[in-house]
Amino acid sequence: MKGMRSLGFAVVAVGLLAAACNDSESYSTPAGTPYDPSKPVEFYTFEPDSGGMRTKCIIKGSNFGTDIENIKVLFNGDREARIISSNGNMIYCLVPKQAAGNNKVSVVIGKDTVHSEKTFAYSVKELVTTVVGKNNEEGYVNGSLGEARLGWISGLALVTGNNLIISERNFFRVRLAALEENQVITLMEGSQYGKPAVTKDRKTAYFIGYGSPHTIYKFEQDNLWQPRRVVSSIPGFDGIIQCAAFGPNEEWLYFRDNTGKFGRLNLEDPGIVEVLNEHCGDTPNATDSHLIWHPQMECFLMSLEFAHGIYKVSLDGKNVEIFAGFNGIGGQDGYLNEAQFTSPMGMAIDRDGNIYVAQVQNHIIRKISYPDGLVSTIAGYNGQSGAVDGVPYKSRFNGPWDIIIDDEENFYIGQFWGSSVRKLSIE
């Protein structure tokens, strides 16, 4: 019976795959029964009952309809599956990324929502790989992703086309790594830049010059990622600026220099520059800092390299509060008031509000769970540098300086001394 059941599932899958036309999974409406709002939607079962991200799944029931624009399949409450096709009684979909565990599955057809009695056992796979350059081999070489050699990475941006824009501190260059085309090229030479601000559509990245006069360049998809100067200087800011950031919208570009001055520049009228706070956070040893807007908390998070902690900063810059760290140097995990950080730098935030921090001096990646504030080490080993790929707890990094997140919530990590880009895949 078990073999017959598996065979039946395979036949159904083949039929629905055929309806989806081709390997690219583009959709065309298959023959089937349209949705009838006068009848109930029924959810019988689904197969398989376990797997990971992108597992092919068949949902069985009745009155689903054939219009995939009117169908949603949700795992674990709010994780939406990609719908490939439906014949009215069976939906073919791809399992979305979600938390590990036994998760509920729901089908939404128009205004009707139905739930399965059984759960889907989702398993998470985690892996660290090197995607650009060679670990601990600094240099200047363009070419394929593996042949390319990079300098000390001080900023990363993920833009459209699955392209990475990379700034190099020591070589005064901005590079582009085309992940799909397997190619690395140089976009600009002669200036130092840190982490850019990237628009939500990922079509534009703004870089602020590291040192005064802080020339701002933008790199746009419409201009084939070639640099265009926005302004030649930011008046009133004489210290080093490591990071540019957007707030809740893209009207203003925010930044903080290493004298502690926090401000913003209006992108519609770049002549408008405002100093929001003259003394934003501690400034030990003229430290570098990173900024990122946290949408759920509705504030900036600001990491300070040699203060070994992270601040919360209000949008107007007036309220600055300790958020995490400032408990001495170390890698102790725990809640916000007890965890230790060593030189936190680049930060990324996932859709649930969890915060990921690259720690350059002790070579690890940390996670701050939102909203409970639990700090954990998710990759690398405290105080040990290296160049080991593989499962996260066995991986080793060399100066992870920046971290960014893609649309599937995988992470790219730019290494300062390691001179390479690593990828932390969580599926």
Feature-to-residue mapping (PLM):
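Blade-level signature of beta-propeller repeat domains, shared across WD40, Kelch, NHL, RCC1
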Residues: 398-427
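Residue-level detector of Asp-centered blade-edge/turn motifs that repeat once per structural unit
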Residues: 158-161, 198-202, 246-250, 293-297, ...
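C-terminal motif of bacterial Sec signal peptides marking the signal peptidase cleavage site
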Residues: 17-20
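Conserved beta-propeller blade signature
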Residues: 163-166, 204-207, 252-255, 299-302, ...
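Short loop/turn segments immediately following the C-termini of beta-strands
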Residues: 161, 168-169, 208-212, 249, ...
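Gly/Pro-rich loop segments of beta-rich domains
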Residues: 59, 124-154, 181-194, 222-242, ...
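A short loop-to-beta-strand structural motif that recurs across blades of beta-propeller domains
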Residues: 172-176, 214-218, 260-264, 308-312, ...
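Beta-strand/beta-sandwich contexts
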Residues: 22-66, 112-124, 129
